[in-house]
Amino acid sequence: MDRQFELTITHAKQFERFFGWPVLVIFLISFIVMLRTQATWVIPVMLVVSIGMAYKGYMEYRVIRPFAEHQNVVRVLRYRLVDCWISAVSLFVLFIPMYVNEDAFILIGGIVALWGLTRSYREKKWEERIHAHQSELPTYEEVLEGGENIWNYHQK
């Protein structure tokens, strides 16, 4: 296995363990506390959560990119990365107007909700594009769980 790819897989596994459930619990508790007390300390917490989401999307791109054999698959992987970044930024931006202007919060909340509602449609279309060019592309989870077996299969 390529040494750089092996380090990327190891780093992605460590990030998943660190950033998975603990941050989700912190996010939910912070959100509930913020709604009850109007605490402004939630904005930096949401910044950390959104940076983590964007970094996770970047790690998914770095892990899956070596398996892409067609340029159109790489393009779709980049679209998915940009989509992840937009989701992360919109999650952070949603919380700032809550303290400044409630009307802006409602407007931005509606935009974020529409973006979230169309996520499954976008994912389905991206999967169709990927399978049209390369049907055997492994998923992020398969690569993290399979490790060297997936890499060896890809090299054959």
Per-segment meaning from a language model:
Residues 34-41, 97-105:
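Transmembrane helix interruption/hinge and helix-loop junction motifs
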Residues 101-123:
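Alpha-helical membrane-embedded segments
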Residues 52-60, 75-98, 111-116, 150:
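Hydrophobic alpha-helical membrane segments
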Residues 6-9, 13, 65, 125, ...:
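Residue-level detector of alpha-helical secondary structure
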Residues 36-39, 67-74:
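Membrane-interface helix-boundary motifs at transmembrane edges
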Residues 51-68, 122-130:
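Membrane-water interface of transmembrane alpha-helices
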Residues 1-62:
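N-terminal first transmembrane alpha-helix
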